[in-house]
Structures are given as C-alpha cells and as structure tokens.
Amino acid sequence: MNLNKHSERKFDLITVGRACIDLNAVEYNRPMEETMTFSKYVGGSPANIAIGTAKLGLKVGFIGKISADQHGRFIEKYMRDLSINTDGMVKDTEGRKVGLAFTEIKSPDECSILMYRENVADLYLTPEEISEDYIKEARVLLISGTALAQSPSREAVLKAVSLARKNDVAVAFELDYRPYTWTNTEETAVYYSLVAEQADVIIGTRDEFDMMENQVGGKNEATKAHLFQHQAEIVVIKHGVEGSFAYTKAGETFQAKAYKTKVLKTFGAGDSYASAFLYGLFSGESIETALKYGSAAASIVVSKHSSSDAMPTADEIKALIAQAE
C-alpha cells in the first residue's frame, strides 16, 4: 500500500483521540497499596502513536480535547517539544480533566492499570471541533477505538473519518479496546465495525478483533475476508508471543515473530507497534519489514519504564532486528 501519495501535504499522519497522564510506579515488584513513588508521562494510545511516529521522523498532527489546567499544559508542551502539531488540540472550557492512569508493576507477568476516566475531557470532543481544513492536510488519519466509546467524541470521530474519505486521506484504525470505557460489547461491535469498514489499514490483537465481531475465538481468515469486502487494504492481527500477521487485499500473507526481551511491564506495546508499522509503510519498506519494525518497537517499549518516553528511534529498531537475526 502506498502511503506516500500527496507528498505536498503538511502531515504524514494525524492521530485522533485521547491524550492523558500516565503515572507509572517507580517501585517495582510491589502492589499499588505499598507504592509511594510514581513518574509522570503523557499517555493515551493516539497520543502515544503521535509521539512514536514523531520520534521516527514523521510529520505528525494531533486532534483531541485536553483539560485547561496544569496536566493539559504538560501534555501540550510535551507534544510540541517533539514537533507534533497541536493546532487540532482543543481545551475543555467546562472544567473536565484529562484521564489518569496509575500503573502497578508487581512483576513482568503481573501488571495492572488503575484508571480514572469519569467525565474526561477527551470524550467530549465535538463534531464542531473537527476541522476539514486540518484533516485534508494529512496523508493518513489514525483513529483510536476508545474515542468511539461515548458521545460526542463518537460523532466527532465519525465526522473525521467522513472528511478523510472525502479528501483522499487514508484511514488507519487502531482498535485500542479498553473495557472500562464501553457500556457493553454489542455497542463496541457496532461502532468498531462501522469505522473498520471505512478504514484502509486496521491494526489490533486477535482479542480486539473478536470484540469487533462480538464473538469469542474468531479466525483470521474470516476477519480478513469480511474486511476486504469493504475499504481495507491491509489487516494486521497480533497474537502476542506467537507474533503478528498482515493480510493484504491482493491475497498476500506476512508474518513476524515477537522479539525476545527482558520484560519490565506489559503495557505500551500496541502503541509502539502501530507507530513503527506505519513508519515502515511510510518509508517504503515491504509489509514484512514493517511488521518486523512493529514487533521490534513493541519489544523495546515493554522493556522500559514508560510508554511515550520509551518510544524508540529507527536506529534502535533496526539494531534490535539485526541483533535478533
């Protein structure tokens, strides 16, 4: 798939959705009740993907709603310092806050996240705050599934997708399923399917695709067959330690292994994977190589303390692949 048409456009990628605060436990191997020290980072899947792709050298913009307070200013400055354009970032004027995520790292196999997502600013992004002039400056618009969980954010995202299609902007959909945000699985399936059927690239875990299909134990063959009846050109399905698969509408199948690493935590892998996979496509690499980039980036991030700060450079990704092969 060629993502490099419209080279005259201002942005390679614009991501849409939440930007929040991650407070990651500094003290490892102990429960939250006993943890006294946390480090603050920018979090939220679309923000992390914006950060990850910017660190890889892409020209990136962001659309989302943040709080008009210290946390909101921290997020905006952090992203601007990475040369991420924040013209699409809206400040909430009604006192809503950004989401907070406290992470607990009991062991590499036992990590959890304590979320505060009630009445958060990002889910109050409105359709009126989506600018066609901004979106049409991008080659690719990336949608995060969590932004579909509630109105008015849901309608804002659907408008963004419609404007992307109107202006020949490719749509990438990162399923990003977070159960604490949704009301029920039927609702998730409806809105995930609605966007997936309009997306050119869909990325998610096998479990996330099962949520989209409202079933358990779904098969890749059936998933890709359905999506290729619609807009999809590439479907990426991740299977954890078993690696990941990419399918194309032309009938090709590619596979990449998961790279071994010393795991510190289990979160952040999906965002780094999506960032590096898209970077590979933008760089003109083969889909197989883009899969390797995604797997390597995920391996790097789970070995480090943060998600956003740990997003790797292209040299780090290539070095890990070379070492592993």
UniProtKB/Swiss-Prot annotation:
What Enzyme Commission number(s) does the record list for this chain?
Answer: 2.7.1.92
Pathway per the UniProt entry: Polyol metabolism; myo-inositol degradation into acetyl-CoA; acetyl-CoA from myo-inositol: step 5/7
| One Gene Ontology molecular-function label | 5-dehydro-2-deoxygluconokinase activity
Look up the record and give one Gene Ontology term from the biological process aspect: inositol catabolic process
What reaction does this catalyse?
5-dehydro-2-deoxy-D-gluconate + ATP = 6-phospho-5-dehydro-2-deoxy-D-gluconate + ADP + H(+)
Keywords per UniProt: ATP-binding, Kinase, Nucleotide-binding, Transferase
Alphabetical list of PANTHER family matching this protein: 5-DEHYDRO-2-DEOXYGLUCONOKINASE, HEXOKINASE FAMILY MEMBER
Q: Which family does it belong to?
A: Belongs to the carbohydrate kinase PfkB family.
Q: What does this protein do?
A: Catalyzes the phosphorylation of 5-dehydro-2-deoxy-D-gluconate (2-deoxy-5-keto-D-gluconate or DKG) to 6-phospho-5-dehydro-2-deoxy-D-gluconate (DKGP).
Q: HAMAP family given for it?
A: IolC
Q: Which NCBIfam families match?
A: myo_inos_iolC_N
UniProt name for this protein: 5-dehydro-2-deoxygluconokinase
Q: Supply the source organism for this entry.
A: Listeria monocytogenes serotype 4b (strain CLIP80459)
